[in-house]
Amino acid sequence: MEAQGSSHDISRLLCLGVKEDSEEQHGQYLGDVKAEAFFQAGEGRDEKGAQGQPGEGAVGTEGEGEELNGGEGHFGPGVPGPVGEGDKDGGTRASGMEEEQHEPVAEGTESVKSEDKQMPLRRPGSTQRRLAELERILLSSGSSSGGRSLIDGWISVCPECRNWFKIRRAAYRRNRRRRTPIPEHFRATSGCPACLGARWGVRCPFATPRF
């Protein structure tokens, strides 16, 4: 009896295992069928959307073309950017105006340079020649009035101007003598032979005269 019960239990367990395997296989099959149906439905929706909106594909191709061209889209005079024909014309006009503005300045500089070139340069040889001529006149004439008048005519100075300079030189010399201290030879300061027997504070006869 016990052997029959155990065999019955084993057969029942085997049947249960077979049923479970068949159920698992059936479930996997149903899952595969559902997945295929879901994917087919999704593809159909994508195709319908693409047919319903034909502009999206064109926009996508245009976007790809812009990316390939480095991000530059439409071209023309109205489009802002360095490639537009309007900007090119404006750039050429601006450059032409700048050149016109710079042309007068260049002409002025050229005229100044030409004037500088035309001005005669003073050479040291001419000055030395004049000095030699003046020295020759002074040596030949001495202190005569004719020689002085000749020198005045040579350096184009009138007698009034010469007298004015003479007065100014005399006044300058007089004021300079007054400003300089007059040296006093005293017995205590220096051994002057004329002041050896003189008393303290007696003025030396060789001192410069006071004014």
Curated annotation (Swiss-Prot):
<feature type="compositionally biased region" description="Gly residues">
    <location>
        <begin position="52"/>
        <end position="62"/>
    </location>
</feature>
<feature type="compositionally biased region" description="Gly residues">
    <location>
        <begin position="70"/>
        <end position="84"/>
    </location>
</feature>
<feature type="DNA-binding region" description="Homeobox; atypical">
    <location>
        <begin position="119"/>
        <end position="176"/>
    </location>
</feature>
<dbReference type="GO" id="GO:0003677">
    <property type="term" value="F:DNA binding"/>
</dbReference>
<feature type="compositionally biased region" description="Basic and acidic residues">
    <location>
        <begin position="102"/>
        <end position="119"/>
    </location>
</feature>
<keyword id="KW-0221">Differentiation</keyword>
<keyword id="KW-0238">DNA-binding</keyword>
<keyword id="KW-0804">Transcription</keyword>
<feature type="region of interest" description="Disordered">
    <location>
        <begin position="38"/>
        <end position="129"/>
    </location>
</feature>
<dbReference type="GO" id="GO:0030154">
    <property type="term" value="P:cell differentiation"/>
</dbReference>
<dbReference type="GO" id="GO:0006357">
    <property type="term" value="P:regulation of transcription by RNA polymerase II"/>
</dbReference>
<keyword id="KW-0371">Homeobox</keyword>
<keyword id="KW-0805">Transcription regulation</keyword>
<keyword id="KW-0539">Nucleus</keyword>
<comment type="function">
    <text>Transcription factor required for differentiation of embryonic stem cells (ESCs) into primordial germ cells.</text>
</comment>
<dbReference type="GO" id="GO:0001228">
    <property type="term" value="F:DNA-binding transcription activator activity, RNA polymerase II-specific"/>
</dbReference>
<dbReference type="GO" id="GO:0005634">
    <property type="term" value="C:nucleus"/>
</dbReference>
<protein>
    <recommendedName>
        <fullName>Homeobox protein Rhox5</fullName>
    </recommendedName>
</protein>
